[in-house]
Amino acid sequence: RIARRQRQMCIRDRNNTDDLVLASIIAKHTKSNCIIITKNQQLIGSGMGQVSRIDALNQAINKSKKFGFNLDGASLASDAFFPFSDCVEISFKNGIKSIIQPGGSLRDIDSIEFCNQNKMSMMFSGIRHFKH
């Protein structure tokens, strides 16, 4: 369970745990593929039901911006791992600073290295959520 924070793996210590937990809970109940963006304990963007994780991310970012939310310092949850670092890179370019995802990709190290180089936080929950 995501509420058991001691089971999460923190890649950096600069995360906003409350926003990450909220985003993960929302992602659990959202149609896959989904990306959830939270800030200050509120949902500010969601992308769901997309074929690709990048499409879900772009949908969530665009919705956030359309409704006037500032993404600087926001948190993001994904219902599945990132097979490449592309979503992490797009998130960073848009101001997102912390991410929670299940982990388990053969290329997790690419995302970890990008986060470390750019002072982002990333947590691995070890839990995949798929709702089709």
Predicted ranges, named:
Residues 34-41:
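Short beta-strand scaffold segments in enzyme catalytic cores
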Residues 42-89:
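Glycine- and Gly-Pro-enriched alpha-helical subdomains that act as flexible
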Residues 12-18, 27, 45-52, 56, ...:
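Catalytic cores of large soluble enzymes that bind and process phosphate-bearing ligands
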Residues 1-11:
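Single conserved hydrophobic/aromatic residue that forms the stacking wall/gate
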Residues 9-10, 19-25, 30-34:
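Active-site loops and adjacent core secondary-structure elements that bind or stabilize anionic groups
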Residues 89-132:
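C-terminal binding/interaction regions
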